[in-house]
Amino acid sequence: MPEVLLVATPGTRIYVRRGVVYAEAPSGEKAVVTADTELVVLATGSVSVSGRALRRLAELGVRLVVLGQRGQVVAEHRPVDRVNRTIEARMEQYRVKATGEALYYAAEMVYAKIVNQAKLLRYLAKSRREPWLRDAGYRVEGHADRLRQIIENEEPTTPEVIRSIEAQAARDYWDAIAQIAPTPFPGRQPRGEDHLNMALSYGYAILYSIAHDALTVAGLDPYAGFLHADRSGRPSLTYDYADTYKPIAVDKPLLTAPRKTDCLDTYMGALTYNARRCIATLVLENIYKTPYPDSRGRKKTLRDHIYTYAWNLAAAIRQHKPYKPFIVGRL
């Protein structure tokens, strides 16, 4: 099973000894990059990495990503052979963008995202014994039903119609979350400076790094999106694709962790080292270690679903077929 190594202790050294890559904390505690390690995440800026370690990580096929204070990926080191060199999927991706067919792929992704939001609310209703959350979940799912009708009837649509339905669902979803949030929460604001918004943004950035790699490996262009606006340097398709997984990959662990307030500590308007370590640990363990069934009953880790469905998306685009994104099964 693929594994991830999180480096979040300031002063850690990453080096090679006898062909083995070690991450050694100032306390002397060591972690080893094993044959199963797929990803090394640096969640602190106070880390030294030797050139030999970078070379050995590449030889082992291990990606290394560096996260900023808000969780955004500020640097990435990847083996060159992880990039799919075929251009067929990308050529078809650009074609469906030009013809407008991409909107149907976008609509399916937004539909899956809304359904996953609704399922999380119903799960929270059951685990917290709060019936009103179940009602909120069905209210959110009502927006998905409207979008499903547009898709099924092949009605002419525009990005504005899809975004409008997505926004209405998001409002109902985050209004419900605000009532159970562990700290005051004004609703989802990507640049919000309250504790929960900063934690969500940090967790989403970790998810983006994994989704970005999955799309790249599948042969797609992460910067050519279907719904998010294209801008220079903006991985629009990564955002479109990752949205499907946000409720289960990030929202769920942050809202249900026994000591979730540890992930919300801030100092001078930024998440503390301990909070960043807490968020990264929760999100990465949820993605890499917790199995979830999809709507067809196939039980895998979210990491495996993310890569599998990226290949499915690339195949659907190449073969001019419909795409069914990830929808979580029974929670």
Curated annotation (Swiss-Prot):
Report which residue ranges the record marks as coiled coil: none
What the entry lists under Pfam families is as follows:
Cas_Cas1
Q: What is its EC number?
A: 3.1.-.-
Task: Write down the required cofactor(s).
Answer: Mg(2+); Mn(2+)
**Tree of life domain:** Archaea
Q: What is the lineage of its organism?
A: Archaea, Thermoproteota, Thermoprotei, Desulfurococcales, Pyrodictiaceae
**Sequence positions that bind Mn(2+):** E166, H228, D243
Instruction: Family membership, please give it.
Output: Belongs to the CRISPR-associated endonuclease Cas1 family.
According to UniProt, the name of this protein is CRISPR-associated endonuclease Cas1
Q: Which InterPro entries match?
A: Cas1, CRISPR-assoc_Cas1, CRISPR-assoc_Cas1_C, CRISPR-assoc_Cas1_N
A single MF term (Gene Ontology): DNA binding
Q: What keywords sit in the KW lines?
A: Antiviral defense, DNA-binding, Endonuclease, Hydrolase, Magnesium, Manganese, Metal-binding, Nuclease
Its biological purpose is as follows: CRISPR (clustered regularly interspaced short palindromic repeat), is an adaptive immune system that provides protection against mobile genetic elements (viruses, transposable elements and conjugative plasmids). CRISPR clusters contain spacers, sequences complementary to antecedent mobile elements, and target invading nucleic acids. CRISPR clusters are transcribed and processed into CRISPR RNA (crRNA). Acts as a dsDNA endonuclease. Involved in the integration of spacer DNA into the CRISPR cassette.
Its Gene Ontology biological processes? defense response to virus; maintenance of CRISPR repeat elements
Assembly and binders: Homodimer, forms a heterotetramer with a Cas2 homodimer.
What organism is this sequence from? Hyperthermus butylicus (strain DSM 5456 / JCM 9403 / PLM1-5)
Among CDD domains, the record links this protein to: Cas1_I-II-III
